[in-house]
Amino acid sequence: QGPVQAFGALVGRPYRADAFGPDVPCVCLRIPTGGGKTVMAAHAVPLLARAWCNVDAPVAVWLVPSDAIRQQTLKALQTPGHPYRAALTTAYGEALQVCVLDEVAQIAPPDWGRTAIVLVATIQSFRIEDAGQRNVYSFSESLEPHFKSAQAQDGGRRLQCLHALPDALVTAEDAARDRTGVLQGFVGQPRWSLANWLALHRPLVIVDEAHNTKTDK
């Protein structure tokens, strides 16, 4: 049959040579277990930031399949001398911050765009179907300085891109459910949420065990 016909017969849709569209590079490397996939991912962050994104201080979201792996990866990326950390410090020196979701609001607004920021999280944290993990998409007053800083920089033009994203704006239903009354003045405006803040920075995304991750979205 050939690979194209065999693919179509197996999955019921045409084979696409550009898996993620014409504007997204797609390279597949087969690496055995223990072959150094994670250290390659660490080296990929500065390479992609420069060659593809053309930025000197990227934001990278590093997603892992479990909390145990999140803790291991976080420790490695934060430990001086560890190969994962060394791959990043070689490129960024001390202008580097590695953090978890709960620490994002503690990074000062001016640091975004000046230091490389690597956010380590579980894939489950961004699954919108899981009500217990929806803090990523919730309105958070702790991000007020960040969104007000973005608003002040260009009169809010930068925030306009969020209007095209799903689940990014405060709705009338959100305001009705809000017992504090804070959201009444934000209906139709972007949520002060972690998901929106990350979207503004168009992060690189590293997905550990991506071959075991799938979505209907």
Question: How would you name each of these model-derived features?
Answer:
Residues Q1-K217:
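RecA-like P-loop NTPase motor core of helicase/translocase proteins
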